[in-house]
From Swiss-Prot:
Protein family (similarity comment): Belongs to the binding-protein-dependent transport system permease family.
Name of this protein: Putative 2-aminoethylphosphonate transport system permease protein PhnU
GO cellular component, one term: plasma membrane
Species of the source: Salmonella paratyphi A (strain ATCC 9150 / SARB42)
Stretch forming the signal peptide: none
Gene: phnU
Length: 289
């Protein structure tokens, strides 16, 4: 007669849960807890009750509406400029090599490591009221006032952001362009395809994932950019990050500042969701930037 022995239950392995607990604890401490404090402060009205009183107050403000429109306008135009300039420069550096092209590529990489205020400071030295360009033009043509004054406007902010964030488009794009099979380009040229047609039908589809990855990163960063707008001091250019700073630091209105910051977070997440939706519609997989 054979005995049927009960199967031993496998011991519960808690080690994976312990490894997961540490990053969750770090996230909760450094991200979720501060975010919950911002949400609580934003939703707490003047009477101490939780509600949407502050939200209605902020949305009805013309200053907030203007800052929101400025933020979106700067973000979209700066991102479009980054995509256009980054695409042209990447195509030249990858497919039209010339002496010094590798050096230029390395210089572009170093731009990412530079603080944004340093680029803005360089713009001030070159295009400012007392900068090199205005000084040279006033000396040559005897102008009484500086003829170049775009730096302290929205156009100056957009140009500075394009200069700062274009390398974020170029890095993934140049890596994608180098992986394109050169035989496809040669075959298209032999068949008599125009260079613009080669770019549109061969290069662009292969580079689309890198373009969308770099463009989405530029869009998020330009939406939340604070240092460039503050350092340039553009007249009449108020953005959501600038409004958060002025409400919290200059006016000590922390409830309104938290509400604007919360709206800015929702705006950033919404823009990122639009990117993910567009990527899924076009069949593009997310790539690291």
């Amino acid at each position: 007669m054979s005995l049927i022995l009960p199967l031993e239950k496998p011991a519960l392995n808690l080690r994976p849960l312990l490894w997961l607990l540490l990053p969750l604890l770090v996230l909760a401490t450094l991200f979720f807890w501060p975010l919950s404090l911002i949400v609580e402060q934003a939703l707490r009205g003047a009477n101490g009750e939780i509600g949407l009183e502050t939200f209605r107050q902020v949305v009805d403000s013309k200053r907030f509406v203007g800052a929101l429109l400025n933020t979106l306008q700067i973000a979209f135009f700066a991102t479009a400029g980054c995509l256009l300039l980054g695409s042209v420069m990447s195509l030249i550096l990858v497919f039209i090599p010339f002496p010094g092209s590798e050096l230029i590529g390395r210089v572009v990489d170093t731009f990412i490591a530079l603080p944004t205020f340093l680029i803005t400071l360089a713009f001030t030295f070159i295009y400012g009221s007392a900068g090199l360009l205005n000084g040279a033009l006033m000396s040559l043509f005897a102008f009484e006032l500086p003829p170049v004054d775009f730096l302290y406007s929205m156009q100056g902010v957009i140009l500075a952001e394009i200069t700062v964030f274009t390398p974020l488009v170029m890095r993934p794009l140049m890596a994608a362009l180098r992986q394109i099979d050169k035989s496809q380009l040669e075959a298209a040229s032999i068949l008599g395809a125009h260079p613009l047609r080669v770019i549109g039908q061969v290069i662009f589809p292969a580079a689309l994932p890198a373009l969308m990855a770099g463009g989405s990163l530029c869009l998020l960063l330009t939406t939340n950019e604070f240092g460039i707008v503050l350092f340039i001091g553009a007249k009449g250019v108020n953005t959501l990050p600038m409004m958060v700073y002025s409400k919290a630091i200059l006016e000590s209105d922390y409830t309104v500042a938290c509400m604007i910051a919360l709206i800015n977070i929702v705006l950033s997440l919404g823009l990122f969701s639009l990117y993910r939706l567009a990527a899924s519609r076009t069949g593009v997989r997310s790539q690291p930037c």
